[in-house]
């Protein structure tokens, strides 16, 4: 797919998995509509950011019932409707919160998310965080039902370490699509604990949230040198490092249209083996 940013046309890179084409760079919706609670005073700012992202060519939007107490979902759905685009052209991820993992709660929360999004189905539904003492089999019984009923098309998890991820794979009646975790150049926790390798070996996407640690990218001389060599920003190098890895996608967030465009363009960058090795 070609994406036009300003006067330049870029070719977006995708991960192809289970007959899906998922963009390497998606749009994270944390802070859209507020943070832990809804902040309608910021709706104009949030809607402007979503409109800009859609106009730039973003198609994957990642939200959650826990983002702004569900208001983020409402604004994402509104932005898609107001853009006048086909529902099939966007890929919507949302998440059920860890306090809602009992069977009936999962079903109820999915219905609430669908209502807030004003959509007939969710493309990807994640367990947002594992909960101590949760009955994962009970949770997946509900999730599998949602897939069978057509309310959810794909299932995934978030913040699952290897043992729990393996359990989730066994419990899901359909191929588990992703484990969404914190992953970046300075944060290799899920590479060190085996999750990244397991995902790459088992056709599961690792979705990297918090992909850019701003304090790190601004002060890292190796990143600065690579950015200068490519004529881009250090943030774009950090995103390109993720986008080049097989079975890895990422979901940076920005309200700033220029930064949104820069993030999208990062998927075009090709880093050399030498540059990648320099990042450790």
Model-identified regions with their sequence ranges:
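Short, well-ordered coil/turn segments that N-cap beta-strands
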Residues: 20-25, 57-60, 85-90, 119-123, ...
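CE4/NodB-like, metal-dependent polysaccharide N-deacetylase domain
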Residues: 106-126, 145-149, 171
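A short acidic, helix-capping loop that chelates divalent metal ions and anchors anionic groups
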Residues: 31-37, 99-101, 217-218, 259-262
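Beta/alpha (TIM)-barrel catalytic core signal, keyed to glycine-rich beta->alpha loops juxtaposed to Asp/Glu
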Residues: 9, 130-280
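N-terminal binding-site loop/beta-alpha segment at the start of enzyme catalytic domains
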Residues: 4-90
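A short, structured active-site edge motif that brings together acidic residues
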Residues: 87-100, 124-128, 182-183
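Short, acidic/polar
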Residues: 39-53, 102-117, 138, 165-166, ...
């Amino acid at each position: 797919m070609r994406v036009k940013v300003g006067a330049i046309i870029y070719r977006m890179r995708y991960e192809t998995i289970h007959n899906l084409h998922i963009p390497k760079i998606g749009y994270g919706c944390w802070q859209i509509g507020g943070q832990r609670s809804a902040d309608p005073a910021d709706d104009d700012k949030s809607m402007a950011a979503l409109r800009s992202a859609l106009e730039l060519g973003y198609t994957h939007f990642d939200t959650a019932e826990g983002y702004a107490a569900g208001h983020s979902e409402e604004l994402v759905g509104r932005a898609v409707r107001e853009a006048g685009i086909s529902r099939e052209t966007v890929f919507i991820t949302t998440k059920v919160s860890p306090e809602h993992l009992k069977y009936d709660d999962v079903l109820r929360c999915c219905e609430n998310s669908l209502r807030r999004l004003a959509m007939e189905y969710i493309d990807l539904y994640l367990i947002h965080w594992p909960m101590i003492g949760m009955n994962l089999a009970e949770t997946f019984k509900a999730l599998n039902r949602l897939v069978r009923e057509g309310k959810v098309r794909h299932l995934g998890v978030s913040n699952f370490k290897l043992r729990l991820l393996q359990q989730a794979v066994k419990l899901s009646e359909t191929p588990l699509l992703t484990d969404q975790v914190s992953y970046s150049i300075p944060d290799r926790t899920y590479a060190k604990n085996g999750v990244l390798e397991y995902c790459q070996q088992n056709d599961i996407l690792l979705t990297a949230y918090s992909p850019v640690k701003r304090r790190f990218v601004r002060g890292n001389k190796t990143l600065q040198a690579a950015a200068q060599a490519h004529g881009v920003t250090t943030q774009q190098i950090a995103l390109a490092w993720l986008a080049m890895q097989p079975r890895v996608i990422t979901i940076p967030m920005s309200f700033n249209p220029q930064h949104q465009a820069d993030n999208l363009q990062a998927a075009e960058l090709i880093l050399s083996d030498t540059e990648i090795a320099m990042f450790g």
